[in-house]
Design a protein with these regions (language model features):
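Periplasmic c-type cytochrome electron-transfer domains
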Residues: 30-52
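Short secondary-structure boundary/capping elements
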Residues: 47-49, 79, 179
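Glycine-rich, flexible loop/turn motifs
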Residues: 53, 137, 167
Length: 230
């Protein structure tokens, strides 16, 4: 390779590396201003999350808050999530469940698309309904190619009677992208390395079965001074 070719090659390499550094920096969302107390409570709508607040289920004035970081394609999530919701429903006067996206694309290639679908449904007031459908029917789309997966998701949107034009626009929107990226940044700050990961009043809690979920919630309720009626 002559000197001129080396110069051209070097310029190309520098440009590529510089571009990679730029992209990496752009993708590193800064949530350093969010402290640990805020991390374990509802985070409202703001520009970084596409003006989409945390999704809440249960008490609006909770004594116990469950933070769920999940990946819709994760088998463990599809088992644990309904149980966490069931326990929240049982103690709904005192317990709140907050869902945050944490799709792991390296092992679950359809997870982020599913997250976008749930967020798009949420923009039409149907987040939890879509959340339920995605988990309950995980086998129908988890290994599908993109076209088949999107057709399945569209059927869910139709089932929920969503405005399909808005749905189609929203799943590809910057708002939804920002929301998912923001949730993941919160998860990384929270120390999430795998899914599902649950925090009960800030404590990382193993959610391996419905009994352990309820036991952890009951313990937190007792610490908060809530009388539990059997």
């Amino acid at each position: 390779m002559n000197k001129k070719s080396w110069i051209i090659f070097s310029i190309i390499v520098v440009a590529i590396v510089g571009g990679m550094i730029y992209i990496s920096t752009q993708n590193r969302l800064d949530v350093s201003d969010i402290n640990n107390e805020q991390l374990n409570k509802t985070i409202g709508a703001e520009s970084r999350n596409g003006d989409i607040a945390d999704h809440e289920f249960g008490s609006k004035n909770p004594k116990v808050t469950i933070i769920e970081y999940a990946d819709y394609q994760c088998p463990g999530c599809s088992t644990a999530a309904p149980k966490a919701k069931e326990v929240t429903e049982k103690y709904k006067d005192s317990v709140q469940l907050i869902f945050r996206n944490f799709p792991i694309a390296s092992s679950h290639p359809n997870a982020r698309a599913a997250a976008a679908v749930a967020e798009a449904a949420g923009l039409q007031g149907k987040f939890w309904e879509m959340n339920n459908l995605l988990y309950a029917n995980q086998d129908a789309w988890k290994n599908a190619n993109a076209a088949d997966r999107d057709n399945v998701f569209r059927l869910y949107a139709e089932q929920l009677k969503l405005d399909l034009n808005k749905y189609k626009t929203d799943i590809a929107s910057s708002r939804v992208k920002h929301k998912i990226d923001f949730d993941m940044a919160l998860g990384r700050k929270h120390g999430v390395a795998a899914t599902p990961t649950f925090y009960i009043n800030g404590k990382n809690t193993e959610m391996d079965n419905s009994g352990s979920i309820e036991a952890a919630v009951k313990e937190a309720l007792k610490k908060a001074g809530v009388e539990i009626k059997n």
